[in-house]
């Protein structure tokens, strides 16, 4: 059994990587005023691909319980499959449904990981919030796509969820990083 400090020293980097990916996507959706279909496909594909890669980097780390790796692998796989599907779609509505479905599946998988492992693995507690936000923002994208909303609205819904996930994971990752630095005697400031 590893101590919380040993776990923190291993998981903070992939958590911070996923936070940066989510924040970059979310902020991009805020500042691009007139995204077209191609921009929407590229942005969703990049977000899903880099989120899946960051999740894979996280779940393959030694302290992550082996049983927790299955649902997190499903989340990463749903996001990567979403990237492949997006390549073949040609309308904002269908792209929105596909991207939203990938976010929903990833969110459900994260909620399963949280429900099964929150007591034994402290970082798994983040999966409650990332899973809920993924589920709700993905569901929002699907509903908006089916109602005929355009790329700006669909990216905005997903981007809002990404900003929430990014901020949560940034706080979590920096907290784990600070614990490690404090124990090593290298923490400065607060």
Could you say what each language-model-derived stretch is?
Residues 1-65, 149-150, 174-190:
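N-terminal topogenic module of multi-pass integral membrane proteins
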Residues 23, 49, 56, 80-81, ...:
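Hydrophobic residues within the alpha-helical transmembrane core of Major Facilitator Superfamily
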Residues 25-27, 81-91, 134-151:
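Hydrophobic alpha-helical transmembrane segments in multi-pass integral membrane proteins
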Residues 35-50, 90-105, 156-163:
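Structural signature of hydrophobic alpha-helical transmembrane segments
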Residues 64-77, 122-131:
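Cytoplasmic-side transmembrane-helix entry/capping segments in multi-pass membrane proteins
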Residues 81-131:
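Membrane-proximal helix-loop-helix units in multi-pass membrane proteins
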Residues 89, 112-123, 141-147, 165-180:
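Membrane-water interface at the C-terminal end of transmembrane alpha helices
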Residues 123, 149-160:
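Loop-to-transmembrane alpha-helix initiation sites
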């Amino acid at each position: 059994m590893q101590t919380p400090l040993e776990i923190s020293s291993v998981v903070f980097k992939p958590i911070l990587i996923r936070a940066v990916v989510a924040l970059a996507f979310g902020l991009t959706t805020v500042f691009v005023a007139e995204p077209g279909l191609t921009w929407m496909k590229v942005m969703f594909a990049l977000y899903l691909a880099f989120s899946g890669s960051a999740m894979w980097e996280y779940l393959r780390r030694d302290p992550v319980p082996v049983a927790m790796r299955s649902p997190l692998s499903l989340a990463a796989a749903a996001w990567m499959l979403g990237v492949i599907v997006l390549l073949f779609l040609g309308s904002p509505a269908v792209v929105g449904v596909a991207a939203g479905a990938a976010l929903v599946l990833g969110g459900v998988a994260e909620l399963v990981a949280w429900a099964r492992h929150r007591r034994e693995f402290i970082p798994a507690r983040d999966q409650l919030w990332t899973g809920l936000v993924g589920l709700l923002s993905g569901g929002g994208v699907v509903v908006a796509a089916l109602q005929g909303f355009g790329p700006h609205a669909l990216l905005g819904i997903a981007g809002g969820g990404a900003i929430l996930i990014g901020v949560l994971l940034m706080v979590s990752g920096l907290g784990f990083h600070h614990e490690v630095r404090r124990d090593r005697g290298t923490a400065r400031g607060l």
